[in-house]
Amino acid sequence: MDSQRNLLVIALLFVSFMIWQAWEQDKNPQPQTQQTTQTTTTAAGSAADQGVPASGQGKMITVKTDVLDLTINTRGGDVEQALLPAYPKELGSNEPFQLLETTPQFIYQAQSGLTGRDGPDNPANGPRPLYNVEKEAFVLADGQNELQVPMTYTDAAGNTFTKTFVFKRGDYAVNVNYSVQNTGEKPLEVSTFGQLKQSVNLPPHRDTGSSNFALHTFRGAAYSTPDEKYEKYKFDTIADNENLNVSSKGGWVAMLQQYFATAWIPRNDGTNNFYTANLGNGIVAIGYKAQPVLVQPGQTGAMTSTLWVGPEIQDKMAAVAPHLDLTVDYGWLWFISQPLFKLLKWIHSFVGNWGFSIIIITFIVRGIMYPLTKAQYTSMAKMRMLQPKIQAMRERLGDDKQRQSQEMMALYKAEKVNPLGGCFPLIIQMPIFLALYYMLMGSIELRHAPFALWIHDLSAQDPYYILPILMGVTMFFIQKMSPTTVTDPMQQKIMTFMPVIFTVFFLWFPSGLVLYYIVSNLVTIIQQQLIYRGLEKRGLHSSEKKKS
């Protein structure tokens, strides 16, 4: 096997991967979801079944911090709009990215409140509470590190319910604190709940381009418990009324999309019920209902939960709740993508540029793999040295394929040559390549991250296709510098067009990935020359390329 045949192996790996991805998209399986169904029920579920109310109409108040711009409905205290000022909707745009939305075209809300037997949000107790607020606009002032937004409601019996949103500077985690003052003569039984609801179908203005040439990031629901660290739950599964029903201490529920997430994190000192629901009209929900709390007459009870609404910043999410950082979608190669990202982030802390960080990590990866690369070229050189013997054997045995195979294997054994030795490094490199792809598509830090010159977003394709062309040029040079034993005319034609085919493949790949491949090819050229010099000394390589 020689370097040019390696290109065929890479091409086959690419084609196989894309066929697999297309099949996955049609079948759309999620291994985590299959595990989930073992712990769920398929009984028809709804928010009402959980004692969770529907939305209502109230007055809208606004809350602005340095990182959040929210709109809260005083009817129930739901967050109906969420803008993220630090993240533009598009590269170069002054319009902030909108995560939560309540419009005729699309619904995505974070609901919360107090349900249970005596909770004001229990549908059996009438309409949702209409909270009173002291003003309609709250702003985190300069020099202020915390902003509280209290909302109060008094029921017909005179009991007072206070719901307070607590915001902190630079934080996407919002604490929601409840105070229940029982002025009656009987205990009040209440339960906190948190629910995320969203339209299943995306309108055009919500399409974030979460798929990129065969690789698709996950959009749907997820949850975590101490027993199940991270489980995805597809919107289609919820829409089909295959509903989640899990009880657990601790954990969280979330809705995910590329780069951003919302999540409710209840307190972990009581049992919480996690559920999903098909709300109808193309809207699905995931939520939690906490264990009931009794507030005795004349007493005041306190409860709390936390809402995450923002980008999937892994270290910050991990500090909010265990395993919340797993919401970053690195696909089935997460076990490679996660350490790769940690290394990349560490390098970035020194160089300050994600593009240069990718270049450095490429050198590190190729340096670690150098022994395998050297073994690959040595194996290919030995295979070339055996070609005259193999050709003579084929001429001697004619059409006896069985004898040919037997004697060829005996020859390999005698000469201590592994015919698959040239493939092994490629098999190792391919998962790293794909893991880097998932990392670029799933890490918020690389969204709109510039490199240099015309590359302003490493997670997007090169707008001028310069990098893919350069990648094709490097492949052409590798091909021309590599000895070949290919004699079949058809294979020779395929080899000739391989750099062109790969250039077309890479036109739609993220710039960061193409940059990685260019640098990797340049390293290959350097390593190839160093290895060939060593092989020449051993008589396994000639500096003059053999002609086919």
Swiss-Prot record:
Localization per Swiss-Prot or TrEMBL: Cell inner membrane
Cited Gene3D superfamilies: 2.70.98.90
Pfam families registered for this protein in UniProt: 60KD_IMP, YidC_periplas
Keyword Transport among UniProt keywords: yes
Entry's Gene Ontology BP terms: protein insertion into membrane; protein transport
Gene Ontology molecular function, alphabetical: membrane insertase activity
Region span, Disordered: 28-56
UniProt entry keywords in alphabetical sequence: Cell inner membrane, Cell membrane, Chaperone, Membrane, Protein transport, Transmembrane, Transmembrane helix, Transport
Membrane topology note: Multi-pass membrane protein
Low complexity bias (residue ranges): 29-42
Domain of life of the native organism: Bacteria
TM ranges: 6-26, 350-370, 424-444, 458-478, 499-519
GO cellular component terms listed in the entry, alphabetical order: plasma membrane
Record's keyword annotation contains Chaperone: yes
InterPro entries recorded: Membr_insert_YidC (IPR019998), Membr_insert_YidC_N (IPR028053), YidC/ALB3/OXA1/COX18 (IPR001708), YidC/Oxa/ALB_C (IPR028055), YidC_ALB_C (IPR047196), YidC_periplasmic_sf (IPR038221)
CDD domains: 5TM_YidC_Alb3, EcYidC-like_peri
Oligomeric form and interacting partners: Interacts with the Sec translocase complex via SecD. Specifically interacts with transmembrane segments of nascent integral membrane proteins during membrane integration.
Function of the protein: Required for the insertion and/or proper folding and/or complex formation of integral membrane proteins into the membrane. Involved in integration of membrane proteins that insert both dependently and independently of the Sec translocase complex, as well as at least some lipoproteins. Aids folding of multispanning membrane proteins.
Family listed: Belongs to the OXA1/ALB3/YidC family. Type 1 subfamily.
HAMAP family linked: YidC_type1
Record protein name field: Membrane protein insertase YidC
Native organism: Salmonella dublin (strain CT_02021853)
Gene name of the record: yidC
